[in-house]
A protein has these predicted regions:
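Extracellular loop and loop/strand-boundary signature of outer-membrane beta-barrel proteins
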Residues: 18-21, 61-68, 181-185
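Outer-membrane beta-barrel pore domains
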Residues: 71, 86-89, 94-196
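Outer membrane beta-barrel
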Residues: 1-61, 75-89, 145-164
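Active-site glycine-rich loop that binds ribose-phosphate moieties when present
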Residues: 66-67, 72-77
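Flexible, surface-exposed loop regions and adjacent strand-edge segments
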Residues: 25-26, 61-66, 171-176
Length: 196
């Protein structure tokens, strides 16, 4: 197919819930297949991994860091749609970790220039429900605004989680949570998190 890329083998888990490349070496990887195809301004993504390093590199379903909640041989499947509309990039994703959890996320991101100042906005909603009986959805919403005027830049960010929890990512650096200096919104219930 034209405008199609297929990666097979061991690779970074390129999803909103994970970090595929990390300078400190804490990236999530898996063995499987990832396919991307672009039609006009829209890219469709699909992936299946039958083994990962999530048993040693992720935040588990209990919210603790690394090594207690996932089996590295548990399969993961994800689908996503990414599109552009003018200066805005939109995306929507669904991920299923077999017998563990289901999650979806939707986001919008944009950057533009106003009189030489680069302004940016990034909004995202994520929901994750474990497969445990009676499990309720963990949800997170965030908005990040940035400005860059040469030597001076600024950022203000807000995230909120619901009363049932904010476990919406497999890494504190993932885009389905909000990370600050030694603080994050991951696995915090009923939280309001501001960052400036």
């Amino acid at each position: 197919l034209q405008n199609t890329t297929v990666n097979v083998g061991k690779q970074g888990l390129t999803t909103p819930w994970t970090v595929a490349v990390d300078s400190d070496g804490n990236e999530q990887t898996g063995t499987g297949i990832l396919a991307l195809t672009t039609v006009g301004p829209v890219t469709f993504a699909g992936a299946y991994f039958n083994q990962t390093n999530l048993d040693t590199s992720a935040v588990d379903v209990n919210g603790t860091t690394t090594g207690t909640g996932f089996d590295g041989s548990t399969s993961i499947a994800t689908i996503g749609v990414i599109g552009t509309a003018g200066p805005v990039t939109l995306d929507a994703w669904y991920l299923d970790m077999d017998d563990t959890f289901d999650s979806y996320t939707a986001g919008a991101k944009s950057t533009f220039d106003v009189s030489g100042i680069k302004l940016g906005a990034d909004a995202r909603f994520a929901s994750l429900t474990t497969d445990a009986a009676g499990s309720k959805a963990n949800t997170m919403g965030k908005l990040v605004l940035t400005a860059d005027a040469g030597l001076v830049d600024g950022k203000i960010a807000y995230a909120m989680t619901d009363k049932d929890g904010g476990l919406t990512a497999l890494d504190a650096d993932a885009s389905t949570t909000l990370l600050g200096w030694n603080l994050n919104a991951l696995n915090k219930a009923d939280a309001d998190y501001w960052q400036a």
